[in-house]
Curated annotation (Swiss-Prot):
Domain of life per record: Eukaryota
Pfam families for the chain: zf-U1
Protein name: U1 small nuclear ribonucleoprotein C
Keywords, alphabetical: Metal-binding, Nucleus, Ribonucleoprotein, RNA-binding, Zinc, Zinc-finger
PANTHER family recorded: U1 SMALL NUCLEAR RIBONUCLEOPROTEIN C
Protein family: Belongs to the U1 small nuclear ribonucleoprotein C family.
GO MF term set: mRNA binding; pre-mRNA 5'-splice site binding; U1 snRNA binding; zinc ion binding
Ranges of biased composition (kind: Basic residues): 49-61
Zinc finger (Matrin-type): 4-36
Region (Disordered): 49-71, 137-177, 205-231
Role: Component of the spliceosomal U1 snRNP, which is essential for recognition of the pre-mRNA 5' splice-site and the subsequent assembly of the spliceosome. YHC1/U1-C is directly involved in initial 5' splice-site recognition for both constitutive and regulated alternative splicing. The interaction with the 5' splice-site seems to precede base-pairing between the pre-mRNA and the U1 snRNA. Stimulates commitment or early (E) complex formation by stabilizing the base pairing of the 5' end of the U1 snRNA and the 5' splice-site region.
Lineage: Eukaryota, Fungi, Dikarya, Ascomycota, Saccharomycotina
Amino acid sequence: MTRYYCEYCHSYLTHDTLSVRKSHLVGKNHLRITADYYRNKARDIINKHNHKRRHIGKRGRKERENSSQNETLKVTCLSNKEKRHIMHVKKMNQKELAQTSIDTLKLLYDGSPGYSKVFVDANRFDIGDLVKASKLPQRANEKSAHHSFKQTSRSRDETCESNPFPRLNNPKKLEPPKILSQWSNTIPKTSIFYSVDILQTTIKESKKRMHSDGIRKPSSANGYKRRRYGN
């Protein structure tokens, strides 16, 4: 059975499964060895660069460069005193950040499409699995007050009515296109569509249709209708 080999710890894991590999990569021993490796590598590169700047000469320059390339990197671990000092400084920085809440980015990206995937720890892809949650089912987990949704949450069916581009709201409107001015020629001159008294005319016509014997102008001078004979 194939097993996962860690290049930093120089050891094989028990199984090559995702859970075993993940538990190893987040372990304290692996993180410490990885941090020491990159710290020592950066320190050696800096020392090598400073050494070259101090000892630049024409005689034997190529030999010194070839010999320095063939040298193996020496892993030098920090002393306990240096580690305690680094941990103390790190705790002080974390305490300072916890006391002073920096909400500049949160306010800047408030309401953006990817806000919940960046500023909510439970939704992040990198540290989302490390957030402490209760042992209840997934939909019953209660978020802490630090991760509570305030006004930044957006429901699925919510329609955003706020204007995302306030600078583009100019009270001065653009003139209509020139092509629209030709449409006035297509309307007949006898049309009453744009008439001012169209409402009153419509009401009068409706009344005439509703009442068969509506108010009409008499056909004769005496006010009596003439009887028609024949067809």
